[in-house]
Amino acid sequence: MRIIVDADACPGKDIIEKAGKENNIPIIMYCDINHIINSDYSEIKYMDCGFQSVDMAIVNAVKEGDIVVSQDFGVAAMCLGKKAYPISPKGYIYSDKNIDRLLFERHLGAKVRRGGGKTSNHKKRNKEDDERLYGNLIYLIKNCDTVLESEELKIKNEE
């Protein structure tokens, strides 16, 4: 098991590293060359600035059982297909039970914006997001064998 992070604009990198260090889980952070990330624990991999280059590097690198931190629903969907455990930087766990809805909502939002409409802005990150991210990372680390089929997952995403 590894923790792979889509680190370009990922809040909570310190929380991810804390969970990884405490459980002796290696962390690999992927970002493009326009971002500088310093870490004494994580391995940092820099990609070209090309369209989706970081996303594709993550999907190509991920293995079954890895935890992937990304706010990109497309990356999450592809990682689910590889039997990995995607989680958002706000701590929401993606699963086969919620990814289709999330992708559909993303599609609808893009369609509205292309038509000149506006969609709602995301809420600012808060302390609860940090706590959810840490708690659900630990939950995934400890329960990765059964988590994606679990009814408990619904509760973890609502906390």
What residue ranges belong to the model's regions?
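Nuclease catalytic cores that cleave nucleic-acid phosphodiester bonds
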Residues: R2-E159
